[in-house]
């Protein structure tokens, strides 16, 4: 909402899909125009020209994506992020980078305080960024909902005449806090704020290995992927260019020539639920698998049995 009101000529949000379905719903509810494309065929050197084809129209206010990606768990490379950042600067667009799954590219030893490698981010390549970090994801702190929106200093302090005319507050950071957060949210509890601050402090001090804690998701993904693949399914978004995607919170599955809705409907008959890739903006056919609730050994056996029955009935 904020980004769409900074410049009357720029109201459109560009989604790099697939993405979190709720974000797409939000722009529809608010009546904000949007564009999107599926990154499946636009990795590496193909990404820049594709994004620029939208930015060159002159009406894109912000670019939105998640990294690691929900639902595909693909991770943009530093070169791809550099491309996005440089284009955002050139066309004066804001990058809203969803880092809900911070440091969960488990192929790399991330999350060690003040030691490389670090989380890949567009913030290295432009000043036009807003980073979103979720307490419920990186710290598995899902009870009292809380998150961080980190805004670059250059963007926070930037004056926008359109904001001043509309709200009598011209500085982006002030408008974000005093107008948009105040009016459009109920805030968050003091206890959640203290809890998140304590977890950030412990992570920075090296006493909380939050990446080690969340690596349990990679173990569950690895086990369930093996079961799906053994029964004839395939990973839809399977590569980060030439490298297999990391195991993590989500991944994507397809089966034969079934469409997303067909596969979802059929799996429900076997007691397996997911969401359709269509709802994520993907142009590929399949479903998103979430392993967060696969927390008991017998569930893996049950999944194996149900997928065996599915494969037998669809041979």
Task: Show where each model-derived region lies.
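Phosphate-binding glycine-rich loop
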Residues: 1-12
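A short helix->loop->beta-strand "cap" motif at the edges of active sites that frequently abuts
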Residues: 11, 90-94, 126-127
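Hydrophobic residues in well-ordered beta-strands that form the structural core
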Residues: 15, 36, 96-97, 196, ...
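Helix C-cap/helix->beta junction micro-motif
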Residues: 30, 90-91, 270
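Active-site phosphate-binding strand-loop segment of PLP-dependent enzymes
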Residues: 41-112
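PLP-dependent enzyme catalytic core of the Aspartate aminotransferase-like
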Residues: 56-58, 125, 265-315
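Conserved core segment of the aminotransferase class I/II
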Residues: 122-215
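Conserved glycine-rich beta-strand-loop-beta hairpin in the small C-terminal domain of fold type I
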Residues: 190-193, 197, 210-225, 229, ...
